[in-house]
Amino acid sequence: ASVDQGGISNDSVIVQEGTQNVAEVLQRDLKNTSDIYQSGWDNFASVDQSGLNNDAKINQSGIENVSEVTQSGFNDLADSYQSGYGHTSTITQSAASGFIGGLLSVASNSANHTQLGMNNTATTTQVGGGNVATVYQH
């Protein structure tokens, strides 16, 4: 497990059980939070956060699951839950180009991926504000 933090008041929790699980967190800027929980074998989780007040949660159990979250906006929420074998979840969230810092609340995006079973893939890309995405695969 690897955590690289810069900026102010960033918080990261990584809990891993099992064998050959990998978790990587890179946090910059202000008040970003990440929680990664992995159990099983050969799972990979990655969180890359910049911006302000972003929250990422990854929970994986099983074998060979991959979850990647990239957040570069404001007040974004990403939640990836995977159980089983061979799932891939990718969530990318960013503020709109030229976004004005005084409108932080407008940038709020939310993405939730839930994958059960085997070999599911989900990709969500959110740019701007007020976007909501929910993916459930079984």
Could you describe each region identified by the protein language model?
Residues A1-H138:
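Low-complexity repeat regions of mature extracellularly deployed or surface/particle-associated proteins
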